[in-house]
Amino acid sequence: MYMAAPPGVPRWAKTVNGERAALHCLGSIYGLKQSSALLNKRLTAVLKSMGFQPLISDPSVYTKGPPGPDQQLVACWVDDILFLNRRDDKQGRFDFNAQLESHFVMSEWTEGEADFILNIRIDRDWKAGTIKISQPAAVEKLARKFGLDDIKATGAPVIPMKPDLRLAKAVGDEIVPREEFDYPRIVGSLLYLSLTTRPDISTATGILSRFMACPGRAHCEAARQVVSYLVGTKSMGLVYRRTGSSIPVAYGHARTNNFAREGDAQDSTFITYADADLANDLSTRRSVSGYCIVLHGGLIAWQSKLQTTVSLSTAEAETLAATDACKQIIHFRLFLRELGRKQQGPNILFEDNMAAIALVKNPEASRASRHYQLKLHFLKNLQERNIFEYRHCTTDLQLADSMTKPTPRDLFSKYRAWMGIA
């Protein structure tokens, strides 16, 4: 790794022709893109020497020992490390920290239960068997950072975006300058929250992110509404339930409405919802894909994404959404299997479009579907291998509908509860 010589270097640090020399770095420098890779390489070597092995599905997660109560886990995010072991094994935690301290300069560590990591607050209720992750401090910081701390929680909107809102690109003098309202940075901060603990704002932030270079007054007001909504609900977060403590809300409504079957695993097997909104974007007529994956009563993965191609039918748009969901299903099955929690049988994928389900069962190259045959055969192959099972649900019970478009208040509140947000 080389760097340009900074001002003030001795005269000898120059080339023959008088140009300033490049310096060869003997170690990584904090802030460079190579630094985190070098740290990860070193950390992996140290953890392997301690008996840990990285997962194939996620190399930032390490395991030691066979699956069970005595298994130890390490999760890393650059230089932030989370160590998990049996609750009563206090000595194991001290030994782990001591071994790391023999290789690295460590900041003060917290012995016991983690209650805060990567700006995420962790709350446990051992009696109720729940664990909650939320980011109230991040919401407050967002409002304060962008001068929106005048927003009051008492008057906050109950939905992040109006369902009838239609936004178009601003042009010319309609574009609001960043000096007046730093739209890109605000939306970027909202996207971070939507990807960590607040899936209920994913659709709204996805729509706002389409106008990073051309926001108008309406876009700025819409962004302000999302921030206002977060301020009013800053204590909310994703709640997960201990196995056997209760039927997850999202699965309970499926059982009640008879498209979840008796005998289906309820706690240890995740279920997936996939949906699409045809021609959602007014300027490009591209559709929006959405999926939600629920485990232990709360979302573990979700997506609200503008499709890269223009779908010519609802069935095509839904197939593209299901393809994205199934790629995530494959990853989670491998991840859980490596942790010794292999999924039993296929994972259920709820879909509200009968045509999309029928096409996967019989992917004939018709004039209407031959241009996306690859995706249809991909889904068919996964069904035949017992990776997932397509199952129909009615539209009013389609949780992923919340990821495709803004919804009215009552519907939004229902979906938010099904996500496990409380």
Task: Give the predicted meaning of each segment.
Residues 1-422:
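Long, low-complexity, charge-biased intrinsically disordered regions
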